[in-house]
Each structure stands twice: as C-alpha cells, then as structure tokens.
C-alpha cells in the first residue's frame, strides 16, 4: 500500500532497531513504563477484560472441556491417550503459550500475531498470517452451532435435519453474535459461567468413579493397533489455538502482567480438564476401545452416576460449543479491527459500536459462519488445520527473528532462554506440524493451497484499492509506529 502520514502518540517512545529494508517492518514498541501522557481516547471508556474472564476466554479458545478427546483412546488405547495429553502440552501448548505471552506483551494490541509477523517479516506476510488465521477461525467457528444441535437432536429429533435445523442454526448464530456485539467483558463473564457449568459434571464424575477405579486399565497399550493420523490430529485439535487470545490484547486490563498469568492458568485448566476425565472414564469402566468416539463421555457418566449425570454432561457439551463460538468470534472480529488499525484493511473495519466492539468484524465473521454452516466439514476442517499450521510456522519464524535481530528490545515478559534456546524450543512443535501435514491427504493439501493463493491475490488487490483511493486506509494514531526510523538505538546496541 502507498505510504501514509502516521501520527504517533509519542515519537520518542517508538524506536526502530534496524533500517527499513525491502519489505521488513522494524520493531517498535511502547514499554510498560513508557506509556506517554495523552488526551483521553474513546477506547479508554471501554471496560477492559480482567484476569478470570481472560482465563476462561483462553479456555474456550483452546479447549472448552474434554468433549472430543474420546477419539484418542479409540485411536491409540488408554496409555498412549493419557501420555499424549501429559506430554503433548510440553511439546506444543507450553511453547505456543510462552511465545504468545512474550510477543503479546511486546505488542499489546488487537492485531496480535498479525503485528508480530509484520514486524519481523514485513506487511505482506503479516497480511497472509491474518488471512489464514481469520479463515481458519471462521471455519472452526462454523462447526459449533452444528455440534450444539447434534447434542440436542437425541432429545429433539426435529433438529436433526430440514428446515427446523437450518432455522435453529441461523437463530443460534444471531443470538451468539448479538452477545459478542454487546461487549467483550460480557462475553468474558458469560464464558466464566459456561466454563464452570461445563467442568463441574466431570468433577462430580471423577469423585463418583474413585471406588471403581482400576489403575491397571490406564496401562493398556497395543502399539500394533494405533491410528497415528487420528491420534495426532485429536491431540493437535484439542491443544492448539493458544495464540488466538493475542488478538484481544488491546482489550485486556494491564496486559503486560495479566496476559502471561492468564496463559499460565489456562494451560493448567485445559490440561486438567482433559487428564482427569480420561483417568476416571478409563479407570472405572471396562475397556471397549471401539466405543471411545465423540460423545462417549455421556455414556460413561450414565454408567457411573445415572441418567441425571448423563444429561448434565450432554448439556455441558452443548454449552461448551456456545462458549467456544463466542470466544472464537471475539478473537476473529477483534483481529480484523486490529488489522484495520494498522492499515492492512480498510478503515471502516476499525469502527467500534457503542459497546466498544468491532461491528463490521463481527458481521463479517458471522456471515462466514452462516455460509459455511451448510457445508460438509470433513475435508474443509482438515484444510483449516493446515492453514493453522502454516500460520504457526510464520509465528515461530517471527519469534526467532525478533530474538536474533532485536535481543535488547523491551519485552515486559521474556521467556528465560537465549536465542539458541528460542530456536531449540521451536523445533519440536515444528516437527509436529510437519507430521500433521505429512499425514494429511492430497485433497486437503490442495484445498489449503487454494485458500492461501486467494490470500496472495487479496493483498495486491487491497494495495490497488488504496492507490486508487477507492476506500480509505489509515493507521491509528493511538498505536506506536512500526516504521519509524531511528538509528540511535541501533547504534547504542553496536556500542
């Protein structure tokens, strides 16, 4: 896009650490103790998200509870399923959460990972990151109204197909979209209530299971009968998306301190929400591996506690889908707002409603959900996973590049490892991504490539629209300037 005049809040607080070469955007940040005095902004009146709601927003961005982890037992047996949910967080979840904590506090704004990649690799790749992540988020979100109705159709068969199902999906999407419109703080506290309701039945189930536990059932393993594709995809599906919360960093109360702590608590909450239900279900019920598919926890609940506990688990599953929907939509819509504030999207995407929410971003995300809700998701969801993988590779590269090029930059939270440690930390999750990609089908890879090519075409189209002034692009004056050239700091580093 053409060069624009950028007005920063405080030029002295925005510092570059390298020359603006080719398409690279130099690092610039306002540190925790460098916040300049400025006139009150419109967004200052908007209530910020505090610790507890943020933890549960992270919980729903990543997990929502143990619904869907049953396939891990079906694919690999009890021992590998349990080991997977113990070991996998150290390979994937913790590195992703740590990178999100460091980069999210380095750039505490709603662009999140888009800004990280733009700063390290340039605006073209930053836009591609935004396109792939937003698209994968919308595809992901289109599943939840459908899954919600799938949990209810056993009690209300009319919701299984036809006009009642279509109408229900539309009404549910509108209601949850309106909740997002009313404000992120409301969404956060609703997520807390939904989260407590979704977790409690498994706590009850765990207590009831104690007298019937047989630890030997946890140790069953058959390496000759493992579906590695299903196993890895189940682990990956249930333990990713930690970076999604970064697109809400601008709405968080004191993000430099709140975000890292919330991610820490979120990792513990998510891991416990998987491991303890698996321990209870595997240890208290005789193993019938073929039955461990989506929804089997409701059968476990009935066997252990009766019909009332089964209904509670089913209601918790339905509630969990609503929680994941509102959390994902918040992340997707604020990402579009953050990209518009950085001049990557037309200015009208940065407009907020009277509740402080990105109205157009919400409408765009909701429209994508409604359009995709009528499709068959088996292949397209796998394609969404591949888009997410490519986006994560860009994030790892951006993280390492910033550590190498700007080691002395202000980082309110910094992972206590050096540059070599940063590279080593990214190797295991990168290998895992390669494994997921290698196990995917050619059809899925083809769909993913088509989606990426669309992103490659949209970026120059937006550049053309900007040059022709068909729509207005601008960079928010409330944000630090990522392109300001100040050699003094770099010279200080050299000395």
From Swiss-Prot:
User: What is the membrane topology noted in the UniProt record heading this document?
Assistant: Multi-pass membrane protein
Per the record, the GO terms for biological process are: polyamine transport
GO terms under cellular component:
chloroplast; plasma membrane
* Chief location category: membrane
Q: List keywords of the entry alphabetically.
A: Cell membrane, Membrane, Symport, Transmembrane, Transmembrane helix, Transport
Annotated GO molecular function terms are: polyamine transmembrane transporter activity; symporter activity
Which cell locations does it reside in? Cell membrane
The record, for InterPro entries, names: AA/rel_permease1, RMV1-like
Per the UniProt record, which residue ranges are transmembrane? 49-69, 79-99, 112-132, 156-176, 186-206, 230-250, 267-287, 357-377, 380-400, 417-437, 442-462
The protein's job, in short, is: Probable cell membrane polyamine/proton symporter involved in the polyamine uptake in cells.
Family (UniProt): Belongs to the amino acid-polyamine-organocation (APC) superfamily. Polyamine:cation symporter (PHS) (TC 2.A.3.12) family.
User: By what name is this protein known?
Assistant: Probable polyamine transporter At1g31830
């Amino acid at each position: 896009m053409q060069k624009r005049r950028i007005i920063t809040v405080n030029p002295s607080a925005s510092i570059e650490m390298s020359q603006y070469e080719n398409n690279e955007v130099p690092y610039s940040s306002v540190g925790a103790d460098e916040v300049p005095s400025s006139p009150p902004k419109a967004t200052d009146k908007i209530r910020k998200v505090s610790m507890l709601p943020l933890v549960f927003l992270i919980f729903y961005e990543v997990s929502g509870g143990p619904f869907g982890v049953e396939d891990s037992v079906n694919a690999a047996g009890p021992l590998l399923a349990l080991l997977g949910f113990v070991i996998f967080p150290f390979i994937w979840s913790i590195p992703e959460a740590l990178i999100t904590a460091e980069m999210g506090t380095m750039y505490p704004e709603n662009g999140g990972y888009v800004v990280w990649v733009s700063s390290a690799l340039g605006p073209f790749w930053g836009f591609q990151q935004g396109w792939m992540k937003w698209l994968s988020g919308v595809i992901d979100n289109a599943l939840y109204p459908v899954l919600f109705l799938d949990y209810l159709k056993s009690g209300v068969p009319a919701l299984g197909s036809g006009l009642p199902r279509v109408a229900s999906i539309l009404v549910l999407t509108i209601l949850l979209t309106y909740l997002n419109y009313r404000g992120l703080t409301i969404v956060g506290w609703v997520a807390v209530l939904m989260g407590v309701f979704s977790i409690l039945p498994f706590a009850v189930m765990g207590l009831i299971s104690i007298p019937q536990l047989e630890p030997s059932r946890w140790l069953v393993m058959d390496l000759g009968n493992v579906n590695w594709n299903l196993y890895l995809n189940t682990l990956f599906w249930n333990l990713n998306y930690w970076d999604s919360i970064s697109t809400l960093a601008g709405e968080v109360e004191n993000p430099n301190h709140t975000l890292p702590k919330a991610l820490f608590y979120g990792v513990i909450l998510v891991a416990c929400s998987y491991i303890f239900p698996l321990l209870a279900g595997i240890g208290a019920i005789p193993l019938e591996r073929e039955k461990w598919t989506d929804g089997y926890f409701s059968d476990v609940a009935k066997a252990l506690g009766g019909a009332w506990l089964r209904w509670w688990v089913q209601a918790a599953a339905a509630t969990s889908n609503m929680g994941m929907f509102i959390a994902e939509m918040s992340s997707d819509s604020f990402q579009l707002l953050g990209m518009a504030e950085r001049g990557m999207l037309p200015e009208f995407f940065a407009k907020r409603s009277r509740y402080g929410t990105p109205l157009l971003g919400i409408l765009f995300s909701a429209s994508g959900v409604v359009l995709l809700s009528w499709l068959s998701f088996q292949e397209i969801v796998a394609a969404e996973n591949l888009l997410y993988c490519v986006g994560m590779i860009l994030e790892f590269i951006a993280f390492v590049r910033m550590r190498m090029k700007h080691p002395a930059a202000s980082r309110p939270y910094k992972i206590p490892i050096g540059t070599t440690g940063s590279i080593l930390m990214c190797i295991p999750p990168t290998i895992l991504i390669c494994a997921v990609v290698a196990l995917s089908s050619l059809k899925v890879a083809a769909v993913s490539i088509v989606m990426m090519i669309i992103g490659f075409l949209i970026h120059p189209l937006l550049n053309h629209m900007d040059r022709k002034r068909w729509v207005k692009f601008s960079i928010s004056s409330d944000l630090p300037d990522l392109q300001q050239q100040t050699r003094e700091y770099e010279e200080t580093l050299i000395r």
